[in-house]
Amino acid sequence: MSDKTRFETGLAMLNQIDGKGGQQVVETLQEIAPDFGKYLIEFPFGDIYSRKGADLKTREIATIAALAALGNARPQLKIHLRACLNVGCSRTEITEILMQMAVYAGFPTALNALFAAKEVFEEAGEEAKAK
């Protein structure tokens, strides 16, 4: 796949998953590291998320579990929590996934992830009311 096609595929995938949230990250990177924004579109979204072996819901579940377990990626976790809602995960599913992380990543890590989810759920609720 050509770089242009990778970028176009990645951008379309990002918009499908995350709408404006991911695009804002890329735009912010234009000021400091435009190439990194390009890589962020091409590799994860153009190459990996666009693969046929797993649907977007499954990919986002894996992503929020990994980001929660890392324990140091709160902004990215919040973006992917929103994306998880966008691709069909319920709040209950998300909560259960994050609670599961207590077993493997510890209670503080799971607690922090649950607090991030609470913020995302509240923001999503406010946006729904505004429509």
Predicted regions and their residues:
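Hydrophobic alpha-helical segments of small multi-pass membrane proteins
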Residues: A83, M99-A102
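C-terminal structural segments of small proteins and small subunits
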Residues: A102-P108
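Short, structured motif recognition centered on aromatic/hydrophobic residues
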Residues: T58-L67, I97-L98
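Short alpha-helix boundary/capping elements
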Residues: A66-A73, G106
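A general alpha-helix detector
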Residues: M13, P44, I79-H80, E96-I97
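Extended intrinsically disordered, low-complexity coil regions enriched in Ser, Thr, Gly, Ala
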Residues: A73-T95, T109-V120
